[in-house]
A protein has these predicted regions:
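Conserved acidic carboxylate
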Residues: 10
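Two-component/phosphorelay signaling modules centered on CheY-like receiver
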Residues: 13-31
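Acidic, metal-coordinating helix/loop segments flanking the phosphotransfer/catalytic sites
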Residues: 34-50, 58
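Conserved phosphotransfer cores of two-component systems
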Residues: 44-46, 66-72, 93
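Conserved phosphotransfer microenvironments
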Residues: 49-69, 83-86
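Two-component signal transduction core modules
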Residues: 51, 98-99
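Alpha4 helix (beta4-alpha4-beta5 surface) of REC/receiver domains from two-component response regulators
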Residues: 79-98
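Receiver (REC) domain switch/output surface
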Residues: 107-122
Length: 122
């Protein structure tokens, strides 16, 4: 069974388009937000399986707030710089995973339910 929706917010429109296309094979609805407020509205409306959030578009406090606001929804963060300290803080704030923005496959793997990950890896 295909998860229904995913919502993403990216600072780079090219990354947003690439992720949206990649995720459309695994999710019925891929909703690209242009702001944190728009992301919140889309998440409240569509109750996504996961939120993919660029750390250049949000603060650690935003990650923590989203995790509490949308309990049960996976929060996958990404950033263009591979910074272990920042990622550790992000995971501590409540993110389920953190990946480099350039690692589309890693972001997709983190967002897709484990039961479907064998199809993603193929």
């Amino acid at each position: 069974m295909q998860p229904t929706n995913i919502v993403l917010l990216q600072s780079d429109p090219n990354v947003a388009r690439l992720l949206a296309v990649s995720l459309s094979d695994s999710f019925h609805g891929v909703h690209v937000a242009r702001s944190l407020d728009e992301l919140r509205r889309a998440a409240a409306k569509h109750r996504p399986y996961a939120i993919i959030l660029d750390l250049e578009s949000a603060t650690l406090h935003d990650v923590e707030t989203l995790k509490h606001e949308f309990e049960g929804i996976r929060i996958i963060c990404n950033h263009r710089v591979a910074d272990e300290e920042m990622w550790t803080k992000t995971l501590t704030a409540g993110a389920d995973d953190c990946c480099p923005s350039s690692d589309t496959r890693g972001i997709l793997t983190a967002a897709v339910p484990r039961s479907m990950s064998s199809r993603v890896a193929a």
